[in-house]
A protein has these predicted regions:
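Bacterial N-terminal signal peptides
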Residues: 6-15
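Short active-site neighborhood of thiol/selenol oxidoreductases, capturing the structured segment around
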Residues: 194-215
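Bacterial signal peptide processing site
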Residues: 17-21
Length: 301
C-alpha cells in the first residue's frame, strides 16, 4: 500500500524531525500559516491520500484522516487548507465533504466506507502542503504533500479517448470470468468496448478497476458505484464499461494492454467520455455515487 507507506514516512518526518516542520523553542510559526493552523490540533497526523495524479487547474483531492490508534476519523465535514509550504499562509481554504464510497446493500466488506473530498484550484505546477481538520469534538489535524505536475499522466480532460478494443461478452463468448473479477459479475458493464462506443458516438463511463486485487485502503468498491450509476441511468443513452487492469486478471502477469494504452499508473480510474470522443471528466481512486451521478448529468446527458 504505497500511499500508506508515504504517510508513515511523513509522520516520521513531522514527529522525529521537529525542526524541519514544527516550531522550535526559539521561534514560533507565522500566525495564520499552515504550520500554525496545524499546531492548533490536539492530535497531529499525516493524511492518507486517495489521489495523487494532479496537473494545474481544478483539483479533486481525496483523503482519509486516521488517528494514532489506526482509527478512521470521519465527521461529515472537514476544514481544508492548501499552501506552498508549511510555513506559508494558505492561498485557498474550503470545506471537504465526506463521500460514501460504497453502495448500500451491495458493498458490505469494505473497511473504509467513506473518504473526504476537497476541491481546490491550483494555478501552477509545484509541491504543495494541505491540512485537513475534521469538524467535531476530536481536535485532530492531518497534513500531507500534494505534487502538481505540469501534465497529468492519465488522459487529460478535453483530450480524445484512446480507441482501445477492450474485451466484451461477445468477444469472450460469454465467459465473464475472463472479463471481470467482480463476484457476481455485472453483465451490463461488459457489453460494450471503448472502440465500438467511440465509433458509435455514444457517451460512456469507463472504469479501469480490479475488484478482486485492489488492496489500497482508499481504492474502494468503484465497480459497485459504476454499476449503481448504470442502473440509475438505464433509460439514457449513456453506456457504462468496466475494464480490468491485469493481463488475464492475474497481477503476476502485469498490466494489460488497455491499461497501458491509456497511460495509467495507478488504479482505479474512471473516465466520462462524451459523444465527441473527448474526456469530459475523470475520477482517480474512489468516488461516491453522488459524485459520479452528478458528473454524468453535467457532462453526458
Amino acid at each position: 500500500m504505497r500511499a500508506s507507506l508515504a504517510v508513515l514516512a511523513l509522520i516520521a518526518l513531522t514527529a522525529g524531525c521537529g525542526s524541519a516542520t514544527s516550531p522550535s523553542k526559539r521561534s514560533a510559526p507565522t500566525p495564520g500559516s499552515l504550520q500554525a493552523l496545524w499546531n492548533q490540533s490536539e492530535e497531529r497526523v499525516g493524511l492518507i491520500p486517495g489521489t495523487t495524479d494532479y496537473s494545474p487547474g481544478d483539483l479533486r483531492i481525496s483523503f482519509l484522516v486516521v488517528d494514532h490508534r489506526g482509527r478512521v476519523v470521519a465527521p461529515p465535514k472537514a476544514r481544508f487548507w492548501i499552501a506552498r509550504r508549511l510555513l506559508n499562509k494558505p492561498f485557498w481554504q474550503t470545506v471537504a465533504r465526506l463521500e460514501n464510497v460504497g453502495v448500500p446493500g451491495v458493498t458490505t466488506s469494505e473497511p473504509v466506507k467513506a473518504l473526504y473530498v476537497a476541491h481546490v484550484r491550483v494555478p501552477r505546477a509545484g509541491t504543495y502542503w494541505v491540512l485537513a481538520r475534521p469538524l467535531g469534538r476530536v481536535r485532530i489535524g492531518g497534513v500531507t504533500q500534494v505534487v502538481v505536475n505540469e501534465h497529468s499522466t492519465s488522459p487529460a480532460v478535453g483530450t480524445r479517448a484512446f480507441p482501445s478494443h477492450t474485451p466484451t461478452l461477445a468477444t469472450a463468448h460469454g465467459r465473464t470470468s475472463e472479463l471481470t473479477t467482480r463476484v457476481p459479475p455485472d453483465r451490463g458493464l461488459l457489453r460494450y468496448s471503448i472502440a465500438e462506443s467511440l465509433t458509435a458516438h455514444a457517451p460512456f463511463v469507463v472504469t479501469f478497476a480490479t475488484p478482486r486485487w485492489c488492496t489500497s485502503r482508499t481504492c474502494g468498491p468503484v465497480v459497485d458505484v459504476v454499476q449503481a450509476a448504470r442502473r440509475q441511468f438505464a433509460s439514457s443513452l449513456v453506456r457504462f464499461i468496466h475494464v480490468e487492469v491485469y493481463a488475464g486478471n492475474d497481477p503476476r502477469k502485469g498490466y494489460n494492454r488497455w491499461y497501458r494504452e491509456w497511460h495509467l499508473r495507478s488504479e482505479p480510474w474512471t473516465f466520462l467520455i462524451g459523444a465527441d470522443g473527448r474526456v469530459k471528466a475523470k475520477f482517480a481512486g474512489s468516488m461516491s455515487l453522488r459524485e459520479l451521478a452528478a458528473a454524468v448529468r453535467r457532462f453526458l446527458l
